[in-house]
Amino acid sequence: MLDRQRIYRLLLRALPAPGYVKGQTGMAREVAAILSRHRAAGASVAFFSDDDMPLCLCVGTAGQVGPVTQDTFFRVASISKMITALCVLRLAQDGLISLDRDINAVLPFAVRHPQFPNTPITLRMLLSHTNGLVDAPAYHQGVGSRVPVSAIIPACWGEHAPGTSWEYSNLGAGLVASVLEAALDQSFENIMRIHLFDVLGVDASFYPQRISGALADAYRVIPPWGKSGFDARERKKRPAGDADIPQPERHYGLAQGNCITNMTGMLALLKAAMQPGYLDAPMIAAMRLPLVSFGQRSPYMQQGMGLFVINEPSICAHTLYGHQGNAYGAMHGAFFDPIAGRGMVLLTSAASEAKTNFLSDINRDLMQLCFSSKGSFYD
């Protein structure tokens, strides 16, 4: 019997392949071939290294705003978790918060696993998906309607004690914003702007309404007649509401996946995780430290704070770090090899969502191309 991933890949092959390779040469042609093979409707890709000019390629459509360009903004989905972690670690480095303090010490509501009431939950656990929370139906039903998070949490506890097991949780990651707001008495949006985006000179926001440039839609390539899951034009028209007001009970739907930036911003953010500067060397090391394995989800992956830690020889001989994003049909990736000084970013409006061992096929192919190649991207 065919499994869902095999069926998906068969359906994908039935779609017409975009002609992105036409006019391309060298590695740019190989990148274009991967984007075509995975039916990317629109994409911006960058490969970079410490000792070479970056290789950048933009193809296809961003949806209602027209062709993808270097300046196109994308909702980067779960890469937001890595971006949020950068800011959290800088705040910890500056002594403004603690990674290992009980979050109940600052939150206006209690977060404690009922089966393990004596085990405190910390920011380190929230950043590493070891907090005991799971994305139960109550989370999916509540996050879109902004139900207070304290009303959702009781129905979202898993079976494992906090700090003992990995369970990918958007609710847990989203709670990071609530903790920061309660600790600093500022909105999450302003915390990220003041302590991360402005410091790095990055144009980014967690609210589409704050993006002045062209913002890509996001939609699924299968079925090909589907509507945009993320209609950028419609999202921009919504009122920003309490974006500048701390609301720990209601701002749990931001940090896990709502960050919006362009390729220039994404490269600056990835490089901030790749080398000391924004963070000092000890904090960089703490961010990359593997805290827990993905278990049955992937034999090659472990979790750091806001980072995947990937040891898969078929992709790269070195350990890779970064994060994947997948929402509304858009597939994104941001990964780096600190030993070789190389990195890659993928931003799309729509692409294949097929996955192997948690990583998407399109990210896997681009990572193999970027991190297994030697010398210049232009040879």
How would you label these PLM feature ranges?
Residues 36-46, 65-125, 160-171, 254, ...:
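Short active-site loop at a secondary-structure junction
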Residues 19-76, 148-151, 155-156:
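Short, conserved catalytic-motif segment at the N-terminal edge
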Residues 6-17:
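Short, contiguous pre-domain boundary segments
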